[in-house]
Amino acid sequence: MSEPNSDHGAGAAVGETRPLYSRVLLKLGGEMFGGGAVGLDPDVVHLVARQIAEVVRSGVQVAVVIGGGNFFRGAQLQQRGMERTRSDYMGMLGTVMNSLALQDFLEKEGIDTRVQTAITMGQVAEPYIPLRAVRHLEKGRVVIFGAGMGLPYFSTDTTAAQRALEIGAEVVLMAKAVDGVYTADPRKDPDAQLLTAITHREVIDRGLAVADATAFSLCMDNGMPILVFNLLVDGNIARAVAGEKIGTLVTT
């Protein structure tokens, strides 16, 4: 049942709390990587890389899925007349560009990073092999999953849910440019409330604009929690991993 303004974490300061999770899947929206424009905003990518590096140094295993919305959005291109399958593949290539950019910034932070793609691109990334991804994580490396599922009609939100389940992550950390899940769009409804806890079923039934229903159904069916939080607040990834009271926790 949804709970406006209730605690779901310890609330201690970052650095004082032992991480609540040992392996997480971080889902990043591609639009944020562009800073609201087409292309990459190096300042945003650096902010994200620095936050991930902080978490990895604390001993948490981090895998990442990135969208490609700062380059292409298949559904929107389809609305303008482009064939959906082709436009989806273009979007997958955009996610690989974002993945390589994040890899570069993470390695500048001293974090060993591997990119695995669902479409074979041997010169720039490894193929997606779940057991190899787990081995990388166990060695303290960040693994970034690019090219979505490698299939049209599947979003990167669904990719994040599937990859999280396959690598044995304990939670999907869904990073947004808003503080969490609201009862309505806060930009349109001044009475919209931030929900600190809600179930997967409620999100789906109420049509709350968080992620696509396929991703939430997959997480609901397999008991995978999702934490929706604001990525653009510095230190929020570490707070999320520590179980602090931020964002919205979605559980079964």
UniProtKB/Swiss-Prot annotation:
Characterize the regulation of its activity.
Inhibited by UTP.
Residues at which UMP binds = G68, D88, M149, G150, L151, P152, Y153, F154, S155, T156
EC main class here is: transferase
An example GO biological process term is: UDP biosynthetic process
Q: Which InterPro entries match?
A: AceGlu_kinase-like_sf, Asp/Glu/Uridylate_kinase, Uridylate_kinase, Uridylate_kinase_bac
**Gene3D superfamilies registered for this protein in UniProt:** Acetylglutamate kinase-like
For this UniProt record, the keywords arranged alphabetically read as follows:
ATP-binding, Cytoplasm, Kinase, Nucleotide-binding, Pyrimidine biosynthesis, Transferase
Which family does the entry's similarity section mention? Belongs to the UMP kinase family.
Q: What is this protein called?
A: Uridylate kinase
Identify the species of origin. Answer: Mycobacterium sp. (strain KMS)
Q: Which gene encodes it?
A: pyrH
